[in-house]
A protein has these predicted regions:
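Extracytoplasmic/periplasmic substrate-binding proteins
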Residues: 61, 211-214, 242-333
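Extracytoplasmic/periplasmic solute-binding protein
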Residues: 143-152, 157, 167, 181-231, ...
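Extracytoplasmic "Venus flytrap"/periplasmic binding protein-like
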Residues: 68-136, 140, 168-170, 175, ...
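Glycine-centered hinge/linker elements that transmit conformational signals in sensory
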Residues: 186-189, 227-259
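Conserved N-terminal structural module of periplasmic/extracytoplasmic solute-binding proteins
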Residues: 2-111, 306, 330, 419, ...
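Hinge/lid segment of periplasmic solute-binding proteins
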Residues: 107-158, 184, 208-211, 215, ...
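Conserved C-terminal helix/tail region of periplasmic/extracytoplasmic solute-binding proteins
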Residues: 167-168, 173, 250, 387-445
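C-terminal lobe and pocket-closing loops
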Residues: 284-294, 305-406, 443-444
């Protein structure tokens, strides 16, 4: 059991890396713990991650826990691309050596839940805390009424644009695109021999699927019928979205390969001049502020197809505990202490993550109120996200790996291999229906 030795005051938390941190330095390591007095926490932020403010937040999180609990947390940093698109996490679980605590997106939830890897956190949560989480980000962490993860954040997608690129192309605010046709036309004007006009994700993976869902939904497409029993992927909305993604590449206004970690990386792409517009999440605000503060940019809602209906897609990483941990009690207690407490220190911790260390939207009402009191959404891109981008939103769905792969294959075929959207959607729908006929797992949503 992770037994607290003394309470943490709000002042001591805000004090940062102080005496308590020096007395109990953060532990780091490469493998999962088999020590009953230690739990491992794998993440793609720190220590030593690309964004210092985010790395520091994770280091301080572990230090605060370690200073007040007998069971210690050992952090392991896994580079973002390896964590989200590589085999590191899956391989560790296949070998029976998965971390005690880790970060999980909705897109990968069913892989781990259906495999029996996720610990039920419900016994550790009060009804008050459960009601404090926004339902749209909790629903993909629930199976029945049981909670299997606590969200860190809400991360909507939008379109970032370079103000300098617009000025060079003699484009003004009135030229900002609102439709797909306008987006392609503006991207063409912004394209130069050294810069693409726009950028969408090209790397296959859960992140690309997540960004594609926004286009699909805006065009009226769906993956499943409303009862979740059959594929609806072979429909006109999906065809239109696949065609649009293909058009961006065949028109020469978007690259076949993104730079850096992927299209979730603002620093290697738009702020570095590789593209003039980029579909990107709210986290880009903090990235640019910390590492490219002189880059001038704006944010608008992602353009939608003519006759379509605007929406954004909501990403949201959650902290989860390994059901097969050697100390599941401590793993669960750590997750709930970090993100699921009514303690003022927990609220302040989450506020700092959501609006200082990594700009995003808080997943808890209490944290939203605290962020508003600090003026987090009063101006600039954060205000645009809160007031305009979030006008209509849908959370990232959770699909089993077989469904994800069918969708990914269709997107990759059309975007990069000049595949026929109708044929690609039909093939994916057939694969999904075949899989559904024998699926036996948690509800898909």
């Amino acid at each position: 059991v992770a037994r607290a030795r003394r309470a943490i005051s709000r002042r001591s938390f805000l004090g940062g890396v102080g005496a308590a941190a020096l007395a109990a330095p953060v532990l780091t390591g490469c493998g999962p713990s088999r020590n009953p007095n230690e739990i491992t926490f794998w993440n793609f932020y720190g220590p030593g991650g690309q964004q210092k403010s985010q790395s520091d937040w994770f280091v301080q999180l572990a230090e605060e826990w370690n200073a007040t609990h007998d069971v210690k947390v050992r952090l392991r940093y896994v580079p973002t691309k390896d964590y989200t698109s590589g085999p590191t996490l899956q391989t560790s679980f296949s070998a029976g050596a998965g971390p005690d605590v880790f970060l999980l997106s909705p897109g990968d939830f069913l892989r781990y839940h259906n495999g029996g890897a996720l610990l039920d956190l419900t016994p550790h949560l009060t009804p008050e805390v459960r009601a404090d989480f926004l339902p749209q980000v909790m629903q993909t962490r629930l199976v029945g009424d049981r909670v299997y993860g606590l969200p860190l954040e809400i991360e909507p997608l939008a379109l970032y644009y370079s103000e300098a690129a617009f000025e060079q192309a003699k484009l003004a605010e009135g030229d900002l695109p609102r439709t797909w046709d306008q987006l392609l036309a503006v991207a063409e004007r912004l394209t130069t021999p050294d810069r693409f006009g726009m950028l969408l994700e090209t790397n296959p993976g859960y992140y690309q699927n997540f960004t594609f869902y926004q286009s699909m939904w805006m065009a009226g497409g769906e993956v499943f019928t409303p009862d979740q029993r059959r594929a609806a992927f072979n429909g006109p909305g999906v065809h239109a979205a696949l065609q649009f993604w293909q058009d961006t590449v065949t028109a020469g206004v978007a690259p076949r390969r993104v730079k850096g970690a992927g299209a979730n990386d603002s620093l290697s792409n738009i702020s570095d001049g590789y593209c003039a517009m980029q579909q990107l999440g709210i986290w880009g605000i903090a990235e640019i502020a910390e590492q490219a503060p002189d880059f001038r940019y704006g944010v608008i809602p992602m353009p939608s197809p003519a006759g379509g209906a605007y929406t954004t897609a909501l990403g949201s990483w959650a902290m989860v505990a390994n059901a097969k941990s050697t100390n599941p009690q401590a793993a669960a207690e750590f997750v709930v202490w970090a993100l699921g407490s009514t303690d003022p220190a927990c609220i302040e911790r989450m506020r700092r993550w959501n609006t200082v260390a990594k700009t995003n939207l808080p997943p808890r009402y209490s944290v939203q109120r605290a962020a508003e009191q600090h003026g987090a959404f009063d101006s600039g891109p954060m205000r645009v996200f809160k007031e305009q981008v979030m006008a209509q939103a849908r959370p990232e769905p959770r699909y089993p790996p077989e469904v994800y792969r069918a969708i990914s294959d269709a997107v990759q075929s059309c975007q990069l291999d000049d595949g026929d959207p109708v044929s690609a959607a039909e093939a994916a729908a057939q694969q999904i229906d075949t899989f559904l006929s024998t699926y036996d797992g948690a509800p898909i949503n």
